[in-house]
Structure formats: C-alpha cells, structure tokens
C-alpha cells in the first residue's frame, strides 16, 4: 500500500471522521477512556475512519480494526500534566518506521502555538514529516493555540 492508498483509507472521498484517544499518555485515567478496548470497539462499530492513539495502544489494539473501515494513526507527541511549566512541550517518542510494524497507517504529532517551546516542536514536526515522506506515510499535525484571544 502506498501513501495515496493510506490517505484514501483515512479520508475516503477526501473526508473522514477521526477520533483522537491519545490523551492516556498525558493524563490517565480520563473519564470515558479507561476501557481502551471498549472505546476502540465502539469506534470501529460506529464506522469511524481513523483513530489517533499512542504507539503502544496501536500495537496492542490494531487487531480490533482488521476487516473494518477503521484505521489507526500513531500520535508520536507526548507531554504530561505533571511537567509543571513544561507541560505544553510535546516531545516526539518514536519514528515513522514504527508505524507499519505496529499496525498503523499514518503519523501524527502536535505543536502548541504560543508555547515557549513552539519552535522546537515545529522542528520536531519537520523531522517526523521527513521520516513519513521516506516511508510513504500520511502525516497529520495537531496544531493547537495556547493563546486565548
């Protein structure tokens, strides 16, 4: 499967419904996300196109998506609420070459605009994007603003 096929799988006809469940690495337990297997089974049954999750979740639960229209995207950015003033600094915890062996079809990472570490996060996103290019993987960015207008 090439990049275009993977992208079409995630965004049939250029559109898709994705659900991020990547929060467990940052802050667990979160109400509604404590039964990971049950959540994923529900999302697959609902016919979502993509589930965005941390790499361990994808490795452990990707088999639940087999034979369905649902694919998994590995979110490689992590920080925790316990990091205090550095909690918004998302670091990359893997590489694009892990995606296919773990059962994913794309990569995702996050940049928090307005964070003191914004430039470093953008640089990390660029490095992951380069890896995704070389592995024929779609790359998705979660770009959030920490600036309240």
Predicted segments with their positions:
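Conserved, mostly hydrophobic/aromatic
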Residues: 19, 99, 142
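Hydrophobic, aromatic-enriched interface-forming segments
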Residues: 131-145
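Conserved small/polar residues in nucleotide/adenosyl-binding loops
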Residues: 147-149
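Anion (oxyanion) recognition and catalysis
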Residues: 44, 126-134
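N-terminal amphipathic alpha-helix/helix-capping segment at the start of soluble metabolic enzymes
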Residues: 1-22, 62-69
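N-terminal low-complexity or amphipathic/hydrophobic leaders
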Residues: 20-61
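Active-site beta->alpha loop and helix N-cap motifs at the rims of alpha/beta catalytic domains
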Residues: 46-122, 138
């Amino acid at each position: 499967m090439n990049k275009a096929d993977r992208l079409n799988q995630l965004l049939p006809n250029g559109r898709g419904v994705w659900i991020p469940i990547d929060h467990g690495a940052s802050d667990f337990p979160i109400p509604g996300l404590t039964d990971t297997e049950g959540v994923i089974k529900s999302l697959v049954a609902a016919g979502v196109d993509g589930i965005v999750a941390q790499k361990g979740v994808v490795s452990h639960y990707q088999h639940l998506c087999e034979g369905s229209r649902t694919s998994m995207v590995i979110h490689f950015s992590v920080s925790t609420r316990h990091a205090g003033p550095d909690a918004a600094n998302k670091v990359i915890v893997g590489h694009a070459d892990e995606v296919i062996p773990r059962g994913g079809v794309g990569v995702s990472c996050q940049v928090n605009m307005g964070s003191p570490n914004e430039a470093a996060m953008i640089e990390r996103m660029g490095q992951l994007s380069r890896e995704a290019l070389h592995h024929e993987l779609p790359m998705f960015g979660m770009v959030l603003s920490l600036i309240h207008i």
